[in-house]
Amino acid sequence: MTNIRKTHPLMKIVNNAFIDLPTPSNISSWWNFGSLLGICLILQILTGLFLAMHYTSDTMTAFSSVTHICRDVNYGWIIRYMHANGASMFFICLFMHVGRGLYYGSYTFLETWNIGVILLLATMATAFMGYVLPWGQMSFWGATVITNLLSAIPYIGTNLVEWIWGGFSVDKATLTRFFAFHFILPFIIAALAMVHLLFLHETGSNNPTGIPSDTDKIPFHPYYTIKDILGVMLLILVLMLLVLFTPDLLGDPDNYIPANPLNTPPHIKPEWYFLFAYAILRSIPNKLGGVLALVLSILILVLVPFLHTSKQRSMMFRPISQCMFWILVADLLTLTWIGGQPVEHPYIIIGQLASIMYFLIILVMMPVASTIENNLLKW
């Protein structure tokens, strides 16, 4: 009798994706972040579901409903902080996952990579709308500033912004629709993640060397299931350290002040995981130019496969490209720092230089480094 996991229509899908999946024998811990993102998504959907049971998406009661969750609902405080800090863990894993893809040349799987970029955009949209829901000062002003950016679109901009707002300012209609979208998007993300996996399993995983590993594959279970469980345990450990010891470390104190349209906070800034893009937006003195730079800072990932000039896939044996990659990482950390600083000297010029460097490294320096390395191979 054949094993049920290989014959049952549903079990067969699970088996081919998580049990008998042929996997390269040498993939490192950098390949753990895919499964960690899956865990983060499940965690966010579950905690979010329980929060939605007690939350009210009305401007008059939203802030107090979040307070009610933290004070009066059984374990409401831990659910709320797991959800808020879970988003931070989600983005840490996302950035690591994308960084791994860039370093080891995983972007040559075009369909997988492009769906990954769509997933990144969808996750950013979800996180932004979730940040608006507690209806604190930073929620309100963040929503006002970011949605207002669309008014930079020529001709239709103003109409588009008012259409998104559902009125002439960020108000009840905006909050209600953001709650609706914030609830539905994670399920769309889950569906897209399935498609992401589907395309990945068409080609099989990449590995640190970037060399095809068809001659040396091992089953996913037990080798990588146990490795993933270790990753998940570390993720939960870090998350719970954050939640139980410093739950507000990554948040903004201004969000504990109820939203007030008549009082602008001194420094409007998004959550830490958007600061790099926010710094790029602010570094251009022109509104439309800033918006374009903001969008391109993420969409530039779509161009990466076409900018790959190297004869080798991975950066493992390419020291000049490695150097460029780590300069890019340092540049992104600089942008993240600048995004949280006020708009004054010397932060303005640092932000502008870091923004120029960001695009220069990806569009010019990395392809040039690859070409130099190709020529060095001939020596």
UniProtKB/Swiss-Prot annotation:
Cofactor(s) listed in the protein's UniProt record: heme b
Gene Ontology terms describing biological process: mitochondrial electron transport, ubiquinol to cytochrome c
InterPro entries: Cyt_b/b6_C (IPR005798), Cyt_b/b6_C_sf (IPR036150), Cyt_b/b6_N (IPR005797), Cytb/b6-like_sf (IPR027387), Cytochrome_b (IPR030689), Cytochrome_b_C_euk/bac (IPR048260), Cytochrome_b_N_euk/bac (IPR048259), Di-haem_cyt_TM (IPR016174)
Record keywords: Electron transport, Heme, Iron, Membrane, Metal-binding, Mitochondrion, Mitochondrion inner membrane, Respiratory chain, Transmembrane, Transmembrane helix, Transport, Ubiquinone
Membrane topology: Multi-pass membrane protein
Protein's cellular compartments: Mitochondrion inner membrane
Entry-linked SUPFAM superfamilies: a domain/subunit of cytochrome bc1 complex (Ubiquinol-cytochrome c reductase) (SSF81648), Transmembrane di-heme cytochromes (SSF81342)
Pfam families: Cytochrom_B_C, Cytochrome_B
Record GO cellular component, one term: mitochondrial inner membrane
Residues involved in a ubiquinone binding: 201
Similarity comment: Belongs to the cytochrome b family.
Quaternary assembly: The cytochrome bc1 complex contains 11 subunits: 3 respiratory subunits (MT-CYB, CYC1 and UQCRFS1), 2 core proteins (UQCRC1 and UQCRC2) and 6 low-molecular weight proteins (UQCRH/QCR6, UQCRB/QCR7, UQCRQ/QCR8, UQCR10/QCR9, UQCR11/QCR10 and a cleavage product of UQCRFS1). This cytochrome bc1 complex then forms a dimer.
Cofactor comment: Binds 2 heme b groups non-covalently.
Record lineage: Eukaryota, Metazoa, Chordata, Craniata, Vertebrata
General function of this protein: Component of the ubiquinol-cytochrome c reductase complex (complex III or cytochrome b-c1 complex) that is part of the mitochondrial respiratory chain. The b-c1 complex mediates electron transfer from ubiquinol to cytochrome c. Contributes to the generation of a proton gradient across the mitochondrial membrane that is then used for ATP synthesis.
Keyword DNA-binding: no
UniProt binding sites for heme b b566: 97, 196
Name recorded for this polypeptide: Cytochrome b
Note: Heme 1 (or BL or b562) is low-potential and absorbs at about 562 nm, and heme 2 (or BH or b566) is high-potential and absorbs at about 566 nm.
Chief place where the protein resides: mitochondrion
Gene: MT-CYB
Organism: Capra cylindricornis
